[in-house]
Structure formats: C-alpha cells, structure tokens
Amino acid sequence: MNVCHVYLRLHLIWKKRGSVMKSAFIGMALAVLLPASVAFAGPCVDAKSAKNGFILARPGIKSEFRPVAGEMTSVTNTYESQSPQKQFLFAGLIEVFRDSDTGRLAMIPFSDLRKLFPLKTGARSTIEFVELSPDKQPKATTTLTLVVKGKETFSLGDCKYNVLAVNETFKNGAGETLDAFTALYSPDLQAALARRYDEGTSAQSVNGYETIKPLSE
C-alpha cells in the first residue's frame, strides 16, 4: 500500500466519523508507512555493486572509491579541515600515487604487485619501491612488508564485512621503521576499512570508517 492510498482511506474515514477517530488512524498510518520506509533503505554494498564505486565516511572525512583499469582504485578524499587528496591504490590497499595541495608523490614498486593477490592468511611479502616527487630527489628506496595475520569482521553501520588483518610496516633504506599499522582490508570491496595502531599495547587504537553507501546515491 503506497502513501497516496493510505491518505485517501484516512480522509474518507475522518470525513464520515469525525475527529474522534483521527488519533487512532494516525497511529495505524504510521504502522503501515514505517515498514515501507524501511523497505526502501538501500542494500549494503557487496563485491558486485562495489565495481560501480562507493563512498566510505566518518566524521571529518569522506572517501569516494572508484575501481579503474590495471587493478587500481581511484580514491578521492574530502576533508573538513584540509584540502582534498587524490590517491591511486593497487587492489585498494597499496598506495602508488598521491596528489594534494601539499604535493605530489608516486611510489614505484620494483616487483609485480599482481603476484601478491589474492591475499591469503599467513602470507608474507616485502615490496621495495622508490618514492618520486617533483620537488624532492630520492636518496634511498623504501620497503613495505605485508603480513596477513588472519580473518575478522568489521561493521559499517548495519553492513558487516569479512576483512583480513594485514600488518603493514614501512622502513627506509637504513632499516628504520617509518610507519606501522594493521589494515582491516575487505577483499570484496577492495578497500581498507580501518587501521589499527599500536596493536597489542595499552595504546592500541582503531581509526576506521563508519558508514558506506553506493557512489550513485
């Protein structure tokens, strides 16, 4: 029953029986219309619909994910407190290009990233790459070590996704750690839904997205 039909039926009943019945029938109308509105809520983005793009968001940031050629994912990040940023991520996980008002950076790997996917629990890989920037000459290479630790689930609103806990460690040419975190990576969406820092310590924290919707909405 759509909204128009409900309205017409209520109007005829009110006209015949007067205002005494209005409160009761308003409650009936809400009972009919509320399930209908819930039914119109869009389904969760899955592996198939993710190919058309989707938006991940949390307070302060909105990220638009668009699959493109070469197994790359184009990501446009819009922030409340800083300028937008554009990224290209291989398989939605490994960053190979970044562009914003603060500069442009390309990460050129020396190995075939396609051989790393699909990721499997227990897999360990080390990637060497060079960072290229128009304003800075590279003095050394950087390494990224990926360790797939296991499977978990992660929720975005009412949508729940199977994710892989992927430990990422970046080191410079001298072997010093530049950054380390655990990415909660969804193979279906080809996107990292969250990052876990200082894992296993009292300072452990999770920085993740909170909602998801199709890009077309």
Model-derived regions: residue spans:
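Bacterial N-terminal signal peptides that target proteins for export
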Residues: 19-28
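Acidic, serine/threonine-rich low-complexity disordered tracts
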Residues: 42-98, 130-217
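Short, Lys/Arg-enriched N-terminal segments with co-localized hydrophobic residues
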Residues: 4-20
